[in-house]
Amino acid sequence: MNHIRNFSIIAHIDHGKSTLADRIIQRCGGLADREMEAQVLDSMDIEKERGITIKAQTAALQYKARDGKVYNLNLIDTPGHVDFSYEVSRSLSACEGALLVVDASQGVEAQTVANCYTALDLGVEVLPVLNKMDLPQADPDTAKAEIEDVIGIDASEAIAISAKTGMGIDDVLEQIVAKVPAPRGQSEAPLRAMIIDSWFDSYVGVVMLVRVVDGRLQKGERFKMMASGAAYEANNLGVFTPAQQSRDALEAGEVGYIIAGIKELKAAKVGDTITLEKKLPNNLGPATEALPGFKEIQPQVFAGLYPTEANQYDALRDALEKLQLNDASLHFEPEVSQALGFGFRCGFLGLLHMEIVQERLEREFDQDLITTAPSVVYEVVKGDGEVIMVENPSKMPDQGKIQEIREPIVTVHLYMPQDYVGPVMTLANQKRGVQMNMQYHGRQVMLTYELPLGEIVLDFFDKLKSVSRGYASMDYEFKEYRPSDVVKVDILLNGEKVDALSIIVHRSQSQYRGRAVAAKMREIISRQMFDVAIQAAIGANIIARETIKALRKNVLAKCYGGDITRKRKLLEKQKAGKKRMKQIGSVEVPQEAFLAILQVED
């Protein structure tokens, strides 16, 4: 046990985390040279393309240190994005050490800081590493100062490396051996293992990635999940060196996989504790208490996904079910919209998660989708005191029946160079933000705001990047539900509500947003044979109106001269025809209209 080192790598997107992992695996001979490919641990195409890691992966490596001993290094690759923060915290709690990789040419970024604090809270030893030292613009001294200022850990011994050229990799491995503590666990205690991650393999079922904390699990033993109580038999265990290697047992302190013929991912929840099912003569029986930190993940952002062709509904459901096999945090339920037909209401962890799910549906399953505006969950207290959760604007009860609406508030940390503080503060105030704190760290500034999640969901991130020329970064965490004066704005076409176009906004912005959406619709919906009235309404109050004028034929073209009554007769006849058409005609709402709501400028 003293020769095991479990560590992970914390880094911002594109600071070289996966490249460093590749180098470490290569140095320890985890894969033959012919199997080495760039970003070995990122197995999904979309992970490689976006340069992000979504699912955790591991590699168990043997390293012969300078002191002549052989150490088992377990590298646990973590996702780096704030949407996947729960998965990050589980990956980190399975480690005793973490390499904090900072791009020497860019300095510290928000996501890194958030994950680094998570690591420090969990008592993980953090070793700073400066990457990209081969670049001419690398500035190690500033980067070290930033690490000390922003994160508050000693960076004087930060290791200078270049993952691309392979410089300094041995120093990193030596530091891991020297500074990362060995796992603390009792091999003679009842089995307790934590699920770090789980994914679905179409051949063997669910594969669980676990960190054994106490005791041991042998092949063929029956174990149970402490959160759900379900029991299974361990058909196959082993470790990844990234390639799969079977073993007969997993011991305390090790990180490996268990395959137990589980059919669905919901059964193997990330963060759950595994223990033995019952006491037998040759084992120590089940543990009494679970490992701390397990929680059910709640989706924060909802959107409707509809197939463009009605006959693609079943295909979309199959695609979502397949995605859910590998993504337990994706929720969906069937939904019917008058405007868009049959589809699904999907729940996501955040905006990146939503984009990735959409992109995977389009890319891996060839789906053509219509996506409605993302919305958040509101707590609504009805007149009779009943509290309901509303995740879809069209489900919001009538104004008269509502006592109060509470919206989700999040704490947002914004990091940026000090030149951009002004514009960023203006943006946060526009979004109804309340400033809580402001700290200067050298040239970097950290602003802390409380903002309604509903304001962040639409376009806050894009705006933040544009006002700060891409330098600002953010992370957020849910704080509480708070009473707020929000209203539902409906869009009516010729007096008919279009449910998929409803939005929930703060009353102070409702007039403006209603007008903007109506104006946008007027540009998008094509002219019909009759007048189309586009109205925005709150309850029964119309707050904005635009009219799309009818196309009309010049019925007077064939009258030369002649009496006015003759012309009037023809015009009246045309008018009556248009009126009749308006009663029976319906307006086609093009696909762009649903997306236009997202782009209404504030």
From Swiss-Prot:
It catalyses: GTP + H2O = GDP + phosphate + H(+). GO terms for cellular component: plasma membrane. It comes from the Bacteria. GO terms for molecular function: GTP binding; GTPase activity; guanosine tetraphosphate binding; ribosome binding; translation elongation factor activity. It holds the Pfam family GTP_EFTU_D2. SMART domains: EFG_C. One of its GO terms (biological process) is positive regulation of translation. Belongs to the TRAFAC class translation factor GTPase superfamily. Classic translation factor GTPase family. LepA subfamily. Its EC number is 3.6.5.n1. Required for accurate and efficient protein synthesis under certain stress conditions. May act as a fidelity factor of the translation reaction, by catalyzing a one-codon backward translocation of tRNAs on improperly translocated ribosomes. Back-translocation proceeds from a post-translocation (POST) complex to a pre-translocation (PRE) complex, thus giving elongation factor G a second chance to translocate the tRNAs correctly. Binds to ribosomes in a GTP-dependent manner. Gene3D superfamilies: 3.30.70.240, Elongation factor 4, C-terminal domain, Elongation Factor G (Translational Gtpase), domain 3, P-loop containing nucleotide triphosphate hydrolases, Translation factors. It is a peripheral membrane protein. Its main location: membrane. GTP binds at D14, H15, G16, K17, S18, T19, N131, K132, M133, D134. This is Elongation factor 4. It is found in: Cell inner membrane. Residues 2-184 form the tr-type G domain. Keywords: Cell inner membrane, Cell membrane, GTP-binding, Hydrolase, Membrane, Nucleotide-binding, Protein biosynthesis.
